[in-house]
């Protein structure tokens, strides 16, 4: 039980730090669609798609690595709660168009990036 817990903790710590750094560096550039939040959600989609495809292709790999990457890294890095707060903030400010654009960009983009992750693994390996 300790190895899976450590895997999630290590991945989660790395993911949280990545998310924080990107938010600090990028989100002020464009407050209507904060690029740091968008980037972590899109990259997280790509990583989780590629990881699941990789582990399906190579099932003999220690499952703790999958936990580290999917539950830990992607769980710590991606952020539905911050995305939700940003959309609500846009709605409260009357920026309805940007709220809709944000929802469509995050959801559609993340789904497409997850598909791309699966596709990349099948293409390259």
From Swiss-Prot:
<keyword id="KW-0813">Transport</keyword>
<dbReference type="Pfam" id="PF02537">
    <property type="entry name" value="CRCB"/>
</dbReference>
<keyword id="KW-0406">Ion transport</keyword>
<dbReference type="GO" id="GO:0062054">
    <property type="term" value="F:fluoride channel activity"/>
</dbReference>
<keyword id="KW-0812">Transmembrane</keyword>
<keyword id="KW-0479">Metal-binding</keyword>
<feature type="transmembrane region" description="Helical">
    <location>
        <begin position="100"/>
        <end position="120"/>
    </location>
</feature>
<keyword id="KW-1133">Transmembrane helix</keyword>
<dbReference type="GO" id="GO:0005886">
    <property type="term" value="C:plasma membrane"/>
</dbReference>
<keyword id="KW-0472">Membrane</keyword>
<dbReference type="GO" id="GO:0046872">
    <property type="term" value="F:metal ion binding"/>
</dbReference>
<dbReference type="InterPro" id="IPR003691">
    <property type="entry name" value="FluC"/>
</dbReference>
<feature type="binding site">
    <location>
        <position position="78"/>
    </location>
    <ligand>
        <name>Na(+)</name>
    </ligand>
</feature>
<feature type="transmembrane region" description="Helical">
    <location>
        <begin position="4"/>
        <end position="24"/>
    </location>
</feature>
<keyword id="KW-0997">Cell inner membrane</keyword>
<protein>
    <recommendedName>
        <fullName>Fluoride-specific ion channel FluC</fullName>
    </recommendedName>
</protein>
<feature type="transmembrane region" description="Helical">
    <location>
        <begin position="68"/>
        <end position="88"/>
    </location>
</feature>
<keyword id="KW-0407">Ion channel</keyword>
<keyword id="KW-0915">Sodium</keyword>
<feature type="transmembrane region" description="Helical">
    <location>
        <begin position="36"/>
        <end position="56"/>
    </location>
</feature>
<keyword id="KW-1003">Cell membrane</keyword>
<comment type="function">
    <text>Fluoride-specific ion channel. Important for reducing fluoride concentration in the cell, thus reducing its toxicity.</text>
</comment>
<dbReference type="GO" id="GO:0140114">
    <property type="term" value="P:cellular detoxification of fluoride"/>
</dbReference>
<comment type="similarity">
    <text>Belongs to the fluoride channel Fluc/FEX (TC 1.A.43) family.</text>
</comment>
<feature type="binding site">
    <location>
        <position position="75"/>
    </location>
    <ligand>
        <name>Na(+)</name>
    </ligand>
</feature>
């Amino acid at each position: 039980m300790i190895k899976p817990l450590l895997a999630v903790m290590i991945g989660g710590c790395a993911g949280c730090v990545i998310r924080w750094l990107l938010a600090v560096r990028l989100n002020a550039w464009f407050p209507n669609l904060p690029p740091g939040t968008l980037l972590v959600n899109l990259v997280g989609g790509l990583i989780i798609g590629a990881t699941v495809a990789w582990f399906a292709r190579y099932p003999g790999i220690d499952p703790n690595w999958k936990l580290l990457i999917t539950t830990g890294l992607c769980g710590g890095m991606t952020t539905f709660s911050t995305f939700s707060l940003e959309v609500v903030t846009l709605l409260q400010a009357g920026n309805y168009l940007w709220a809709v654009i944000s929802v469509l960009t995050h959801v559609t983009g993340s789904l497409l990036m997850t598909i791309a992750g699966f596709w990349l693994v099948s293409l390259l390996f």
